Regions:
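Acidic, low-complexity intrinsically disordered segments
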Residues: 4-50
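Signal-transmission linkers at sensory-effector interfaces
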Residues: 36-82
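Helix-loop-beta substructure at the N-terminus of cytosolic sensory domains
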Residues: 85-125
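Regulatory sensory and allosteric helical modules in signal-transduction proteins
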Residues: 125-165
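Short hydrophobic beta-strand micro-motif common in sensory/regulatory domains
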Residues: 165-173
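Short hydrophobic/glycine-rich mini-motifs in sensory/regulatory modules
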Residues: 172-181
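Regulatory loop-to-helix N-cap segments in sensory/regulatory domains
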Residues: 185-201, 211-218
Length: 218
């Protein structure tokens, strides 16, 4: 009889230890965290303690996740209020830059717009972009994050561009796509391909809605 036969026997006879309780007190197992031996009962207690620790760690992680989400939601709310209070396109842009830097700690922000924005075309945000970039922005269903700037967006960050290691791009759109928001950081882990982008998408929607007030054809 081998170990597998014994295991199978115990499965077939679940009442074995009820009928032979003394066996439990006579069988000793190696301690999982040391060299001594312990009884099966002690082993079960240790196993339960380990499970409890894992559950506690998971609960703490979920609580932290919820608190982090609440904090981000509050920041999004503050940006929304600032955009509502903005009195012109310049105010929308300044509120966007300020809140992203101060609340979201995004160190590098650039934005490009195209279309008719009622006399604001002299601003840097209306610098010409390539047709390929427009096509890319139109195809961007969700924010894109990763270690490389897409198309020529790295040039938007001027002399800071060479030291930037992660990027996020968010399409700005209403009925049609009319712009692109680019975020960047020196930290490689700040914007990475597998990260969740729900809040980035919400930010894009808020900023787009605020900007649309000043566009006649977006």
């Amino acid at each position: 009889m081998n170990a597998e036969d014994i295991a199978q026997y115990l499965k077939v006879h679940p009442n074995f230890f009820s009928e032979h309780a003394h066996v439990l007190t006579e069988v000793y197992l190696p301690h999982p965290h040391g060299g001594r031996t312990i009884s099966i009962g002690e082993c079960q207690v240790l196993a339960l303690r380990d499970k409890v620790k894992l559950l506690e760690a998971k609960l703490a992680e979920l609580i932290q996740f919820g608190e982090d989400n609440d904090a981000v939601s509050e920041k999004v709310h503050r940006l929304g209020l600032a955009l509502i209070l903005a009195r012109d396109l310049e105010g929308v842009l300044q509120s966007t830059y300020f809140n992203l830097r101060e609340d979201f700690a995004v160190p590098h922000i650039a934005l490009r717009l195209w279309g008719d924005f009622n006399g604001y075309s002299d601003k840097i945000e209306f610098s010409p972009v390539t047709p390929d970039l427009r096509t890319y922005a139109e195809s961007l269903a969700h924010p894109a994050c990763g270690p490389h700037a897409l198309y020529d967006t790295s040039t938007w960050f001027g002399q800071d561009a060479p030291r930037l290691r992660s990027f996020a791009t968010v399409a700005l759109r209403g009925e049609h796509t009319f712009g692109l928001l680019a975020l960047a950081s020196e930290e490689a882990e700040r914007f990475y391909p597998e990260m969740g982008t729900l809040y980035l998408k919400r930010l894009g929607e808020l900023i787009s809605t605020a900007l649309l007030q000043y566009s006649s054809n977006a």
